[in-house]
Amino acid sequence: MGKTTQKGHRQKSFYRGVRAEKWAAWWLRCKGFHIAEIRFKTKCGEIDLIARRGNLVLIVEVKARSTLAEAMAAVSRVNERRIEAAADIWLARQKDRALLCVRFDLIAILPWRWPQHIPAFFMSNK
């Protein structure tokens, strides 16, 4: 693959991810969640979506794949640790952090299907 082709592929993947995150955010809003952050970036990693409903905080990884199995397999243990570290930074900035219940979810965006929301996709080691 040449430089132009690699750049084009990365750019296409980036915009596909942005569209998937917007679709997932819409889905969570339909479920009554407030979107607190989109693409929350830290030096430790990035969280695709942070959503709140009352004291429940969802830390959401969004994956656009052909199948649910591919989306689930795309989140490695290393990814989980990075997401956890970024979540710790976000939570430390919340005044009501002691009251919050945090859950790590996955939303899979699949072709021609409604988003697939997998609650508690992984658990924190803390």
UniProtKB/Swiss-Prot annotation:
<dbReference type="Pfam" id="PF02021">
    <property type="entry name" value="UPF0102"/>
</dbReference>
<dbReference type="GO" id="GO:0003676">
    <property type="term" value="F:nucleic acid binding"/>
</dbReference>
<dbReference type="InterPro" id="IPR011856">
    <property type="entry name" value="tRNA_endonuc-like_dom_sf"/>
</dbReference>
<comment type="similarity">
    <text>Belongs to the UPF0102 family.</text>
</comment>
<protein>
    <recommendedName>
        <fullName>UPF0102 protein BH12350</fullName>
    </recommendedName>
</protein>
<dbReference type="InterPro" id="IPR011335">
    <property type="entry name" value="Restrct_endonuc-II-like"/>
</dbReference>
<dbReference type="InterPro" id="IPR003509">
    <property type="entry name" value="UPF0102_YraN-like"/>
</dbReference>
